[in-house]
């Protein structure tokens, strides 16, 4: 800390020995050592304080630089966002107007309401169209329907007779078949008696084994007698 050489220290020691004497010199040396130690600790704390202040200043500078960079990035993003919005507005302005779209139709244009039910006017027009059919056409269509039904009735008769014949053969075959007697067999569940394990004998065997494992000869404790 102090730029003292060996000669200066020896000189100071000689002066202290002359001034203080050999009796008070050790105590003065201890006091001087304590003072020097306190001074060194104080200087070390001050140095540490300066170092922390310097580090904090560097951190503040780094924080300011980081905030400045973040602000620049934010401004650039805002500029790009505004440019994109302007370009989108330009594109939307250049599009065709909505009036040129095809006209949208509603259910009323097709003669039905929102639930899909036809209006009364549409039902009346439909019934009028059906009533305008010629009576001759009605008679022709009814005759055709009757002719078709007669043909189907004439062709259905042999099918019914074949079915009756098949049923008759089935019934006669089932009547002539021999009767088979069934024998009922019943099974009776019988409980099987299981032998009871010899628990008492196993317990006795375990006790005898434990007794066999015990030491046969035990050392007798020796009593110590205190001598008075």
UniProtKB/Swiss-Prot annotation:
Source domain of life: Bacteria
Per the record, the major location class is membrane
Q: GO biological process: any one?
A: protein transport by the Tat complex
Q: What keywords are assigned to this protein?
A: Cell inner membrane, Cell membrane, Membrane, Protein transport, Translocation, Transmembrane, Transmembrane helix, Transport
Instruction: Outline the segment boundaries, as ranges, of region: Disordered.
Output: 126-162, 196-228
Q: How does it sit in the membrane?
A: Single-pass membrane protein
Q: Does the keyword RNA-binding apply?
A: no
Query: What Pfam families does the database record attribute to this sequence?
Result: TatA_B_E
Keyword Oxidoreductase applies:
no
Write out the biased-composition intervals (Basic residues).
Answer: 206-228
Q: Which InterPro entries match?
A: TatA/B/E, TatB
Identify the GO cellular component terms for this protein: TAT protein transport complex
Q: Where in the cell is it found?
A: Cell inner membrane
Q: What are the TM regions of this chain, as residue ranges? A: 1-21
Alphabetically, the GO molecular function entries are:
protein transmembrane transporter activity
Quaternary organization: The Tat system comprises two distinct complexes: a TatABC complex, containing multiple copies of TatA, TatB and TatC subunits, and a separate TatA complex, containing only TatA subunits. Substrates initially bind to the TatABC complex, which probably triggers association of the separate TatA complex to form the active translocon.
Protein family (similarity comment): Belongs to the TatB family.
Q: Which HAMAP family match?
A: TatB
Describe its function. Part of the twin-arginine translocation (Tat) system that transports large folded proteins containing a characteristic twin-arginine motif in their signal peptide across membranes. Together with TatC, TatB is part of a receptor directly interacting with Tat signal peptides. TatB may form an oligomeric binding site that transiently accommodates folded Tat precursor proteins before their translocation.
What is the protein's given name?
Answer: Sec-independent protein translocase protein TatB
